[in-house]
Amino acid sequence: MKYYASRLLPFYVSVAVVVGVLIGSFYATHFSGNRISFINTSSNKLSDLLHIIDERYVDTVNMADLVERSMPQILKELDPHSTYISAKDVEASMQDLRGSFSGIGVQFTIYDDTVRVVRVIPGGPAEDVGLRPGDRIVAIDGKTYVGKKIDTEGTMKRLKGEAGSKVELTVRRSGVAGMEKYSIVRGDVPVHSVDASYMLDATTGYIRISSWGDNTYGDFLAAMASLSAKGMQHLVIDLRGNLGGYLQAAVSVANEFLPKDRLIVYTKGRRFNQEKYKSNGRGTYQRLPLVILVDETSASASEIFAGAMQDNDRATIIGRRTFGKGLVQVPIEFRDGSMVRLTVARYYTPSGRCVQKPFTPGDEEDYEADLLTRAATGEYYNSDSIKTTGQKYKTRLGRIVYGGGGIIPDFFVPRDTTGITSYYKEVYMSGMMTQFAYWYADHNRKLLGTLKTPEVLAAHLRRTNIVEQFAEYADKHGVQRRNLMIRTSRSLLERMLTTYVVADLFDPAAALQVDNVGDPFIRKALNVFKEGRAFPTLGEKKTACTVLDFIPSVYSAEYGLQTKFALGATRPTSRPGQYRKA
């Protein structure tokens, strides 16, 4: 009995701590201006327990630390998306959605115990002073900063800072004798959620949206204006890997494609009246043929946009069933700068469906395993494996759609695991390919710099057998070469390595453009436009695409964050070995 009670003590303490902390006048404001207030509990029993622990426990207890550790425990008993963010992590969690962060404006990696500049972000302070890709940072503010003890978190802490503050960098540059010193005034570094926009062919525009943030709508309009000037008559919006963001950003973009008074989304919760978001009829692209690309990592605000277009029969959805997040969070800030993002409502698509997939409160492990379960049941490979047991709803034309587990696309594109071997998994998950790409780009920067376009660079890499060079590099760095597996994975390895090197020498947008060549999602989209099927019609059946895509996607979203009275995402994700910004 004593053992059982001792096992439950952490839970009781968690409850006591959180309730004790929440009692009072904490509030937040959602985008419509309504305030949320916590109601004082009529019972002080749990807060009394916390006081007793503080006063009488056998050992001294760090109560602040106990609060920090307890709050996530109690919140996960509610739902998978109510979360606690410590004060030190709040700024980072908001960075990509705010549209900018304060720092020097570089993308870096740590290689051979040295901080290396991979990319200088356009419009940032580092660009103004002349920092270049390939530069080695060997000292920060006069203190040597090299060796095995340096890490990513420490580097970001030293390079980021308040706008207007200074940081002194000592840099070693290839081909230059001695060291160079730079005094950089930190400033606002732009963060764009429209990763790429270009013409797929003479009449088809392509836009990749990686998240829904403060700048998304403005970036989207700028991209659309540019594509329109180039003769765009059809549009592909790529939301693969887009984990979500602000509801208003998704609503604003959806408004551009809908006639007046079309419902886009509505929210409803126990303490919130139903709130509807409708189009205002001033959208510029109401008749533009539209295809939306989604996959299992398209979530939240991405599902709002795709759901609004599908329910209004405004676009054709291509890909795989989306993540299935239909919960709305509101941020509640504490005096110490920390934050709770609490689920306060559900959102519903125009047909009335909630796309939130089922979950068991407190069973976070099962919820997070859902995507693996989909793979195990064959859902990624066969559209017939998609469960459609949820409630049926109808679009404006009367097409059947389903609630309770994401957006099911109109055309299914399966995965192909042909090139996936244990060797490929090892070099991918270890970050070895990213490491090699930096090494290769850095050691061949002068030669590769003469190749003026991403397409020319990609062709050069294929001619020079980059896969063999990578296999030799990996073997020297701890991954034993396995020739049969390398042959099996050759096409996939070549694709990934080419994309990484292009990203290092040009930028992620150029890499995405190279990676999209031959993409089965895009081939299907072009066929839909060619066949005049971008606007869905009644009686059209969902079909599988006969071509296959590779996995994993090279540029999946790096961040997905729950923020504002809007939408969260799933969990933050990143590709192994990814570079960081500062």
Functional labels for PLM-detected ranges:
Residues P10-Y27:
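Hydrophobic membrane-insertion alpha-helices, especially the h-region
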Residues Y57-I121, G164-A196, D515-L526, R533-A544:
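Extended, small/polar residue-biased N-terminal targeting/export presequences
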Residues G134-R136:
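Structural motif
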Residues A301, D313, R320, G324-Q391:
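Polar, glycine-rich mid-to-C-terminal structural blocks
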Residues L567, Y579-A582:
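Short, solvent-exposed mixed-charge patches
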